[in-house]
Structures are given as C-alpha cells and as structure tokens.
Amino acid sequence: MKRVVVTGMGAITPIGNSIDAFWESVKAGKIGFDRITYFDTADYKCKLAAQVKDFDAAAYMDKKAARRMEQFCQFAVAAAGEAIQDAGLDMEKEDPYRVGCAVGSGIGSLQAMEREHSRLLEKGPSRVAPMLVPLMISNMAAGNVSIAYNLKGKSINVVTACATGTNSIGEAYRTIQYGDADVMIAGGTESSITPIGIAGFSALTALSSSEDPARCSIPFDKDRSGLVMGEGSAIVVLEELEHAKQRGARIYAEVVGYGCSSDAFHITSPAEDGAGAARAMTNAVADACISPEDITYINAHGTSTHHNDLFETRAIKLAFGEHAKNIKINSTKSMVGHLLGAAGAIEFVTCVKELQEGYIHRTVGLQESEEELDLNYCKESYQGDFEYALSNSLGFGGHNASILVKKYAEG
C-alpha cells in the first residue's frame, strides 16, 4: 500500500489561531480557560470554557462566504487554508478529483438550531430561515472546505463524537493508502460553547465543577472533576509519499498506523476494563507492523473526567503490559479543553510537532494522581528524540480510535 505523509498543518485554537501560535503556547504551558463570554452563565453550574479568541472570519475568507457559514465551518475553512498554504499545495497544478476532504464535526451548529428554534417559537414556522438545515448539519464542514479550495475528490464527514477528528484523519490516511486519492485535507472542527451545549453536558455531570481556570481541566489528577468545553479546528494535509516528493514538499512526519474498535457497552461511559480502547491501540500498532515496545509516547484522550482517565489508564496497561510503565503519557486537553469533534485533530498536530522537535509537553495542572493512576503522565515536559507518537480518542457511543505517526525517514 501507499505510504502517507503529513505535509501541511493549520489550527484555530483557544491558545492560538495558527499552528505556530498554538505550538508556542503549548511549549509555554499556556491554558485557554476563562469565563464564558458568549452568553450569561449566571444560572449555569459551569462558567468556564476554552473559547477561541480574536477570531475574525473575514481575515480568512470573503465576508459573503463567511455569512453563509456557521462558526464551526468558518474555523475549518480558516485552518484548512493555513494547512494548504503550509503544504505549498498549488491547487491549480493538482487534479482536483485526486484531492479529497475528510473534515468532521461531532455536533455541527448548535448556534443555528438555538437561533432558529427561538424564531420558530416567537414568530412561527414560516419565519424559520430557509438555510437552517444546510447551516446546521455537521457535514457542511467538509462541504465548505471542499468548496473553498476546489477539492473534488472523496469528501466525507465522520461523526463519532469525541473520536471524530482522529477517525477523519485515519480515514483520510486509508483513502491515500488504497490509492483513491493523492492528497487529503483532513481534521476536525467544533463550536459548541452555547447555552444548550453547556447545559446538556452539565446535565450529564460531565463538566468540571471548578471555577479556577488553573484547576478546571486537570487530566489524571486526583482532584479532577470533569471536562472543560473547548472549540476550534485543526486540519492537516496528508499526501501520498511519492506525490509529495515529486513536488518537493516539506515532510513533517509519516502516518503509519490506524486502529479502531467499539466498546459496545454504554452511550456515554467508556468500558471499565478498557478492553475496547486497548484494542484500538493494539490495532494501530499492528497496522504499523511494529512492536508494542516501540511505543514510548502516547497523547491520551485524557478528558479530566474520573471515569475516562481511570479507564484509559487501564486500557494502556492492557495494551502494553509492563511496558506501560515506560511510556510517557500526556493530555493536550490540560491546555485547550475538550474540542469534541476537533479534539483528535488538534492532538494529532501536537504529536507531529512533538516528533518534529523532540519535545513532549507536560500535562499542565497535574499535581498528584490516585493510586491506580500509576503511569507517567508527564508532570514535566521532556526533551529528546523519539520515533513514534500514538494518539487516542474515545467517543460517546463507545467509539475508540488510535492513530500512529512516525518521525519521517527516507527508505
């Protein structure tokens, strides 16, 4: 099968609206948590989120196009534009039918639904906006990215809740592996910090109860109390190796493994024994034809909920046995919160940057873990070369996905 490499990256995040800005913030241990400003939270238990700051859609697309998109699509189009530019990809020189798109969103636009539902109740059904459905549905992220950049190849929208970003990149990887595309623009996007979004997750008792930005999202810490909602987008350019070499592209890393499974257990809780998540990891490692002992770093799903962090720890132990003690594990959600459908994508680009620079970021805010959480969750950052990075995503409904990226080497 074809080899697949990463040649471009773009990001809109709570700690930076470009890959470079995001990465500098990661290395500085910057957190993106603050009081929600999109609406009045006086009646809400949760008052913190990781909002994108200073985003102006008109800086990335013309105003007319921006008005026809909800924010989750604007984030994706902006991040995709950066990724394509970063890759040096000239679409006028490409066969557009060989360039595809796999950009997912876990929810789509809650903003559009809330806005038009209010209009329905106040003014009646005849006043609901005719563009409600195409503005709201999650596949419009892939649709708008394809339209904006003339991508006429395979276009898909994966919706697997919090595993969406990882599944999107994984399915793009498979598409190129199988020879169905030369290039795929892939990733995830989300914008769900809305009244119903926060109320819904709060009703699940999934959100952090902390009002301290420094202690609200603390994966693997004994005092963790829930996730913190984030928003944004991360998009990558994946490319068939020979195609990338022929056009002289810079190669960041190589995607070498992808594994999935289903817990088939519960609609919100991961399986207690971690067997499903473990299988996704072992499938990704087997796909790369390497040994479990070759894995020395995992970017965990690490949501800062009691169950996820405990059960993911069990999954890592199940997948790697005694070797789990030798693996460095961190959670990017300690800085950006949970980006839902974009989470796996932002964590993937984090892995690529870490491989590129030989740097593993710390899990910000981690102080002390309970007894069963006895692995190395990176209280401190690490500097030094390593070859593989494994990124995990676990979604509501029992969706487990792991993707494995390798430091690029010729041969």
Regions from the language model: what does each represent?
Residues 59-69, 99, 103, 123-135, ...:
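Cysteine-centered functional microenvironments
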Residues 1-65, 242-254, 349-363, 406-411:
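ACP-dependent fatty acid/polyketide chain-elongation machinery
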